[in-house]
């Protein structure tokens, strides 16, 4: 999948954490995101649902956005960027696209991402967290994956892995931020894969009509 574990979550200094409180707060945040959405989500509501105090939350997370970020992309979840490498570029690209769409289509992620993307514009720390979480080493690893496909003759010469990366990640983010509520995810992934595979195989110098 594309999302990769980033550095440890940012928390303010203080006494050792009660891991039970962490778990309860993160679970309450995920539940409320799905129930009320990001704009209506409040720290007070999370505290009530988790049966903890507001100060207990703010000792761990500096803002609602940073709490939501960790709730939807847990630091202890295996989010390593796994690249399938079967030697079949089209099949492997389809697997990567499908797994990326699956991550972005989780109910709590669908509820959180538009708000996080809006907030990160004025929050450099959150922007850095999101950049590390959404990319980390994935961009470089994907570019190397594309280079190997080019070397095998499965993709056209001169194909830029970073552009292909932006194409399907951008499609996944748009699907989350502005797409319809109900999407046939497997069909969407198949059509996106077909479109991008076709683009990777265009002969040099040939223009798309």
Functional labels for PLM-detected ranges:
Residues 98-104, 113-122, 193-200:
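Helix-loop "lid/cap" segments that line or gate small-molecule binding pockets
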Residues 107, 111-114, 124-151, 161:
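Amphipathic alpha-helical packing segments from all-alpha helical-bundle domains
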Residues 1-10, 95, 136, 140, ...:
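C-terminal peripheral helix-coil segments that are non-catalytic and often amphipathic
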Residues 40, 63-68, 77-79, 93:
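Short amphipathic alpha-helical segment with a characteristic S/N-K-E followed by hydrophobic residues
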Residues 1-49, 55, 65-66:
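Basic, helix-initiating cap at the start of DNA-binding domains
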Residues 80-113:
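Hydrophobic alpha-helical connector segments
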Residues 22, 43, 65, 86, ...:
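Short, structured helix-loop boundary elements
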């Amino acid at each position: 999948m594309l999302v990769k574990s980033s550095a440890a979550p940012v928390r303010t200094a203080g006494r050792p954490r009660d891991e039970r409180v962490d778990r309860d707060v993160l679970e309450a945040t995920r539940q409320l995101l799905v129930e009320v959405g990001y704009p209506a989500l409040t720290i007070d509501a999370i505290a009530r649902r988790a049966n903890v105090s507001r100060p207990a939350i703010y000792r761990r997370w500096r803002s609602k956005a940073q709490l939501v970020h960790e709730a939807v992309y847990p630091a202890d979840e295996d989010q390593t960027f796994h690249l399938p490498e079967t030697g079949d570029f089209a099949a492997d690209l389809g697997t990567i696209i499908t797994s990326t769409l699956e991550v972005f289509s989780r109910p709590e992620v669908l509820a959180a991402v538009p708000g996080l993307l809006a907030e990160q514009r004025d929050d450099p720390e959150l922007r850095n967290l999101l950049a590390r979480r959404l990319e980390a080493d994935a961009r470089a690893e994907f570019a190397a994956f594309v280079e190997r496909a080019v070397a095998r003759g499965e993709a056209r010469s001169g194909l830029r892995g970073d552009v292909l990366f932006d194409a399907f990640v951008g499609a996944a983010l748009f699907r989350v931020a502005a797409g319809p509520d109900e999407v046939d995810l497997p069909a969407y992934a198949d059509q996106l894969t077909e479109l991008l595979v076709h683009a990777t195989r265009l002969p040099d110098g040939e223009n798309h009509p």
